[in-house]
Amino acid sequence: NEIFENVDPALIDRIYSSKEGIDLSEFDFKDVIHPNECFVLKSDRNSVLARYNPFTHSICRVTKGRNYGIEPRNAEQSFAFEILNDPNVKLVALTGKAGTGKTLLALAAALGKLTDYKQVLLARPVVALSNKDIGFLPGDAQEKVAPYMQPLFDNLNAVSYTHLTLPTT
C-alpha cells in the first residue's frame, strides 16, 4: 500500500470530518493515484486510511466496517473490506499470502449483499489434486473434494451465525 507523507494535517482533519470526502484537486499526488486505490495519508501529527473514489472524484476516509461479526484487523483488510462493500465497484481481485483473511472478508461482504441478490457463489479454482484425477481417489465425490474445500467451509463457520438471517423466498 502506498503511503503519502508530509500531507497537510488540515486536509487529514477535513477527511475525518467529511462524509463526501475532499476533492482530488486539493492533493499534490492527484496525478499518481488510480481509481479505487487505497493508501495512507500521513502528516507530522495525524494520519488516515484513505481511498480515491472515482465516482465522486474525491479522497474519502476508509472506515472500519463490519459484516456478520467479521471486521478488518489491519489497514490492508480495511482497504479490502471498503472496496468489497462498495456497490459501485463491480469486480475486486484480492491477492496476498494464504491466511491473511481474503476469503473471509469476501464472504462477509457477499453475505452483506444477500438483501440485493438471491445467492452467494463460493468457488475455488479448478486444479488437479496432487496431479491425480479425482476418479482414482477412494471414496465418493464429496469425500474426495472435502479436503480441498475445507478452507472455504472454515470461513463459513467463522461467520457469526447469530448475525446471519437469510432472506425468505
Predicted regions and their residues:
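Conserved P-loop
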Residues: 105-161
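Conserved small/polar residues in nucleotide/adenosyl-binding loops
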Residues: 162-168
